[in-house]
Amino acid sequence: MKYELVVGLEVHCQLNTNSKAFCGCSTRFGNPANTNVCPVCLALPGALPVLNRRVVEDAVKLGLATGCSIAPSSILARKNYFYPDLPKGYQISQFEEPICTEGMLRIDVGDGCRDIRLIRIHIEEDAGKSIHDIGDDTYIDVNRCGVPLLEIVSYPDIRTSREASAYLQKMRQIVKYLGISDGNMEEGSLRCDANVSVRLFGAEEYGTRTEIKNMNSFKNVEKAIEYEMQRHIDIIDGGGTIVQETRLWDADKGETRSMRGKEFAHDYRYFPDPDLVPVLVDQEMLERIRLELPEFPEDRERRFVSEYGIPPYDAGVLTVEREIADYFERTLTVCGDAKAASNWVMGEVMRTLKEKYLDIKEFAISPERLGGLIGLIGKGAISNTIAKQVFELMQTGEASAEEIVDREGLAQVSDTGAIERTVDEILEANPKQLADYREGKTKLFGFFVGQCMARMKGKANPQVVNDVLKSRLDG
């Protein structure tokens, strides 16, 4: 391919504060339309904004996490434009003096890591929402007006659609680890605009870019960028000219369509907001927030390998989400077996979460109860097969694994005499299979094990069953 893709991303991260950026209204998603409002949200005359301190702290957290320089003083500015869902006629944002500048995000794209530079992270407020699907009219819901956002702007360092998706996934992971956002793309907590252009390989100058909006999933980000790249190439190869514009991604049709001409900074007539004082971040605040930062995914992954001895793959899976990593460590504290805890969390726990569309916080089995279940397996009190039955029962109540085993009579049978009697009965009932085994069809060993376990309702100690069978079959 003679063309090189060039992409820069603008990510809007909605903060999970209880109140809005410049007033005390709730930020709760899903409330009835126009109920999370006040004179500030509605831009009523005389209503003055007051900056939410938590918004500043969250911006500093993300800035530190991405290696940015934190400005001791930054300015809130008015971004002026008209839209029906923007009551003030301007959006409070930052322009010439943002709170965070010059950071970096390292992404893993499978065949190695790449560093994507960040131009800036700045504070801004969200706009309202236009609702077009009620009859023939358009309605305005201003609940979202003033909800705090951080806009993260990257340099045009991204060269493939896969890198763009990896960047967005990494950013989502970081904001979730920091606890500043839930990163939910479907609800709009994490939104992404892509500035896409192409140029000849080896060229220094960037091509004319288009901005792509309305990408609400990682997969759609990849598809939209791929489509737009090919659209640019087709136009250039056909002798045409790329128009700098904003385009909307249509996931149903798998294409972008023109939305409006691309605005420039001067179109918004930015100027410092006279109603708001500069945002100050002193050294004491900076150091306090630095000490509050969590252990980040890469560091935690390395520690899981070195401290617990689990494989790098397991450590990578367990640390993708902070809550899963926390759950694993609390489970391990109880059971003391890192590999067993890893297998259960990655296996049965994650399977259940996926099947039931649950978050780990909603999962019925606490890590302490799961640790108790794994401990019973380690002591030989129950088999893995029985443990899976107990696991299902634990989701329907608060009983411990031990209580369920006692109540249901599921304790493992390790009595050699009882197992020998069962083995003898199975061998007597299957003379053909016994003869075939002794003639060399040794794969039938698994058949006999299965028959014994079924006869004893899965409660027999598998190791004892294996030992008794070997002595009977090979003796």
UniProtKB/Swiss-Prot annotation:
The record ties this protein, via InterPro entries, to:
Asn/Gln-tRNA_amidoTrfase_suB/E, Asn/Gln-tRNA_Trfase_suB/E_cat, Asn/Gln_amidotransferase, Asn/Gln_tRNA_amidoTrase-B-like, GatB, GatB_C_1, GatB_Yqey_C_2, Gln-tRNA_amidoTrfase_suB_CS
State the oligomer form and interacting partners: Heterotrimer of A, B and C subunits.
What is the uppermost EC class here? ligase
Q: What is this protein called?
A: Aspartyl/glutamyl-tRNA(Asn/Gln) amidotransferase subunit B
Would you identify the family this protein belongs to, as annotated? Belongs to the GatB/GatE family. GatB subfamily.
Its EC number(s): 6.3.5.-
Gene name as annotated: gatB
Which GO MF terms are attached to this record?
Answer: asparaginyl-tRNA synthase (glutamine-hydrolyzing) activity; ATP binding; glutaminyl-tRNA synthase (glutamine-hydrolyzing) activity
Which Pfam families would you find in this protein's record?
GatB_N, GatB_Yqey
**Any one of the GO BP annotations:** glutaminyl-tRNAGln biosynthesis via transamidation
Q: Name the SMART domains for this protein.
A: GatB_Yqey
Key word Oxidoreductase present? no
Q: Which HAMAP family match?
A: GatB
- Which reaction is this enzyme known to catalyze? L-glutamyl-tRNA(Gln) + L-glutamine + ATP + H2O = L-glutaminyl-tRNA(Gln) + L-glutamate + ADP + phosphate + H(+); L-aspartyl-tRNA(Asn) + L-glutamine + ATP + H2O = L-asparaginyl-tRNA(Asn) + L-glutamate + ADP + phosphate + 2 H(+)
Its keywords, alphabetically, are: ATP-binding, Ligase, Nucleotide-binding, Protein biosynthesis
**SUPFAM superfamilies membership:** GatB/YqeY motif, Glutamine synthetase/guanido kinase
Q: Species lineage, top-down?
A: Bacteria, Pseudomonadati, Chlorobiota, Chlorobiia, Chlorobiales
Q: What does this protein do?
A: Allows the formation of correctly charged Asn-tRNA(Asn) or Gln-tRNA(Gln) through the transamidation of misacylated Asp-tRNA(Asn) or Glu-tRNA(Gln) in organisms which lack either or both of asparaginyl-tRNA or glutaminyl-tRNA synthetases. The reaction takes place in the presence of glutamine and ATP through an activated phospho-Asp-tRNA(Asn) or phospho-Glu-tRNA(Gln).
